[in-house]
Amino acid sequence: MDTPASLNDLQHTTLAIVLAGGRGTRLGPLTNKRVKPAVHFGGKYRIIDFALSNCLNSGIRRIAVVTQYKAHSLLRHVQRGWGFLRGEFNEFIDLWPAQQRVEGAHWYRGTADAVFQNLDIIRSIRPKYVVVLAGDHIYKMDYTRMVMDHVESKADCTVGCIEVPRMEAVAFGVMHVDEERRVTGFVEKPADPPAMPGHPDIALASMGIYVFNADYLYSLLEDNITSVATDHDFGKDIIPRVVTSGNAIAHPFSMSCVSSDPSVEPYWRDVGTIDAYWAANLDLASTIPSLDLYDRNWPIWTHQEQLPPAKFVRDLNGLQGTGTNMIVCGGCVISGSQISRSVLSSNVVVNSFCNIAEAVLLPQVSIGASCRLRKVVIDRGCHIPDGTVIGEDPVRDGERFYRTDSGVVLVTAEALKRQTAR
């Protein structure tokens, strides 16, 4: 394979495919109405904005978003917020919903099948390289560095990887690599993840980011679709096949992580559980967060609603609304309440005499007067009645709402309706 003549050539011969059709069942009721990449994050963003922004900032401007499960809010968000690329310059973000495009008339049966069913579109774009991305992780990464590493190493497939605590690796593909970063073993979501040599408590996990030579990817997908014993999945089928019969190279996240502070540990989060989602949101409210949303050299783009500025006001008794270590978005009004280490999304209203800590409030949440809330995620559009207390009585919380083993409480409109019906 010839090395591209320039970085510009590399960027213009790469197609990024963002997989955004999964149910996200580990997020519980939070994904009952929306696909996981469409879930709000960090106050003003959607989860998918991080993968799309990475593409844009990396100079990769030919992007496809593959959708299936409850995709309406995701499709609307991408159409409204990401329609600024110029087709006349061969820039685009295409939406590829499941359409039963191939013989057999079935929906996407797995991540690999989702790409296979769009092979005719991919071939018409004529990329040299295809970057396959999960649309549900939080991180900043220069994909062009990874593509360049792929080309320079003469790999058939390059797999993004990161070191994680061994027992957390049960949710990921786990890799073995040799001294030259060649992948020699790969197992998807093992019950007992193998440790890295010399590091018994650490495993090398796949980030769900792959770079393929386009022609090689086509042949892999065409072979996979005819296999009897297959889940049509990249992690379960395609990557193990490359490891055994091709040249798969590991690409450590540290090689292409984008950070405004090189001394900070590379930040990547799978927000696939309520606990992880809550913690990653609150990471952003830290004094010096590991993920810098204020880096003008690598901005996170999103749909910008036209909203009034946030404000803190005194209530009728003169009590001042205050907040520390928190993110507050446009349209928010905080009246005479104390809030700490929290994320308030757009159009959140907090009435007087409340005490709120370690809370993630999604858009259009309204908090009644005299509420005490701690360690909560409150879904979009919920109204919390006056005097509500959450986060102080584990038994009571579990009876009323979805509560994780670590004590994070998810409040949804459906759960609130059940309370009023009793």
From Swiss-Prot:
Pathway-wise, it operates in: Glycan biosynthesis; glycogen biosynthesis
Biological-process GO terms, alphabetical: glycogen biosynthetic process
The UniProt catalytic activity note for this protein reads:
alpha-D-glucose 1-phosphate + ATP + H(+) = ADP-alpha-D-glucose + diphosphate
Role description: Involved in the biosynthesis of ADP-glucose, a building block required for the elongation reactions to produce glycogen. Catalyzes the reaction between ATP and alpha-D-glucose 1-phosphate (G1P) to produce pyrophosphate and ADP-Glc.
Q: How does it assemble?
A: Homotetramer.
| Naturally occurring in which organism (per UniProt) | Paraburkholderia phymatum (strain DSM 17167 / CIP 108236 / LMG 21445 / STM815)
- Show the Gene3D superfamilies listed in the entry: Hexapeptide repeat proteins, Spore Coat Polysaccharide Biosynthesis Protein SpsA, Chain A
Q: What is this protein called?
A: Glucose-1-phosphate adenylyltransferase
Any idea which GO molecular function terms this record carries?
ATP binding; glucose-1-phosphate adenylyltransferase activity
Q: Which domain of life is it from?
A: Bacteria
Q: Which gene encodes it?
A: glgC
Assigned protein family: Belongs to the bacterial/plant glucose-1-phosphate adenylyltransferase family.
Q: Which PROSITE patterns match?
A: ADP_GLC_PYROPHOSPH_2, ADP_GLC_PYROPHOSPH_3
